[in-house]
């Protein structure tokens, strides 16, 4: 049998031939290494990925460009400003206010101790004059001696209404009640004085308005309140008088001038001779007197003011 054609030596260019007796066949060498093949595959994969990313970026750019462009028939809602207070702009807490000076019209409370052997009335009058404040005695306790009281007498009242009898008491007496007021003069009649009730050694109780000195036989404790710028009112107010005062009209005028010190109230009746003239001013500063019109001086609005000059504070 003839040899097959593949067993013979075939001369092929670029291929190495082996002898017929070799049992192995060599693969053709294409001069391509594995590293080169892997690099080419990786480069191809990376190239395809970059192309895909570029395409995605182009698509996003197109979409974003389409969003900014208004479409036909679309209604754009206007941007609303945020309402309310911006964050962090709340009112800061205000610093505390410290009042370093009391109002001159403030009512002050006092606990007064009067030493033994001292005249209670003279001590209170001196305190009111030096501090330029009115004193209202609310209560008191202690022991006094040799008291002179004014009491209403039945015979005196029958003979002349308003009459009173003076009673002089000798010895020591315990204070049951003590009330009254003191103004740093000048003051209207009846606005200054003390009313006292006493208990004797044998249990008798007497009382009345204090006349003359009131000597303390031991420490006397008083509860009092002081005030300033008192206003005197005449009650009841009549309708016509109230209307005139409300309208600012009046016939009389107040003459400012004397401030402090003693003396009678200063008033002028230059306007007219009727009884409803401007009420007198007691120790009132000139800047508190209202200016009058062309017909006369200023007039207080139906009130009698006791605006005493402010003295140096005791603390």
UniProtKB/Swiss-Prot annotation:
Residues 1-104, 239-285 are annotated as: Disordered. SUPFAM superfamilies: AF0104/ALDC/Ptd012-like. Its main location: nucleus. One of its GO terms (biological process) is defense response to fungus. GO terms for cellular component: nucleus. It is found in: Nucleus. Slightly expressed in roots. Keywords: DNA-binding, Immunity, Innate immunity, Nucleus, Plant defense, Transcription, Transcription regulation. Residues 61-74 have a biased composition (Basic and acidic residues). Residues 80-92 bind DNA. Residues 245-276 have a biased composition (Gly residues). InterPro entries: AHL15-29, PPC_dom. One of its GO terms (molecular function) is minor groove of adenine-thymine-rich DNA binding. The PPC domain mediates interactions between AHL proteins. Transcription factor that specifically binds AT-rich DNA sequences related to the nuclear matrix attachment regions (MARs). Negatively regulates plant innate immunity (PTI) to pathogens through the down-regulation of the PAMP-triggered FRK1 expression. Positively regulates defense against fungal Verticillium infection. PANTHER family: AT-HOOK MOTIF NUCLEAR-LOCALIZED PROTEIN 15, AT-HOOK MOTIF NUCLEAR-LOCALIZED PROTEIN 19. This is AT-hook motif nuclear-localized protein 19. It comes from Arabidopsis thaliana.
